[in-house]
Amino acid sequence: TEVLMKNVPYHLMEAVALHHYAVVDWTVKGPSKDFNEEIYFKSMKAATKMEELVTKHSAIMDKYDPEEKVALFVDEWGGWYDTEPEIANGVLFQQNTMRDAMIAATTLNTFNNHARRVKMANVAQVVNVLQAVILTDKEKMILTPTYHVMKMYKVHHDAQLLPTSFENVDYSLGDDK
């Protein structure tokens, strides 16, 4: 981001792209369902990293572009887990759970709070795959927990951001917060 913002004339770029997935470990991503508290904790910790990433990228962008002519596009975000073992090899499919709803809500809150710079954000894939809003099986279709979070957040579209803050206790697991 620093190199782009420092060296590329603003009229040559509309935005800087950022990708971030809530991944436990890129080697063993963990299950999409039937996960334990440790996996849930690590997934949520990875999801909350979006706040840090957007804040740091925005600070660099503000340094070179205080008029906010260049946007931050979060091209891909969401939970990413290992493919279900019963699914054919080479096909990426993952079940969606309440953990994914929490990841979606946490991430959408970050985007709302940074709406002055984040002008576009795309869930990775919308149907059957990462952070899906719809799951299909032949002629059947279900709306996922992520879908319902998206539906709840649609009232934020073209709305006025009211800054709020709160204090809470940290959620910790062992020595990790």
Question: What do the PLM-derived regions correspond to, one by one?
Answer:
Residues 1, 52, 99-103:
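Short, glycine/acidic-rich beta->alpha junctions
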Residues 2-48, 70-71, 75-85, 93, ...:
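Aromatic- and acid-rich polysaccharide-binding/catalytic face
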Residues 20, 69-177:
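Aromatic/acidic polysaccharide-binding cleft in carbohydrate-active enzymes
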Residues 57:
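Active-site-proximal structural segments of metal-dependent nucleotidyl cyclase/transferase enzymes
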Residues 61:
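Conserved hydrophobic residues forming the short capping helix/wall of the S-adenosyl-L-methionine
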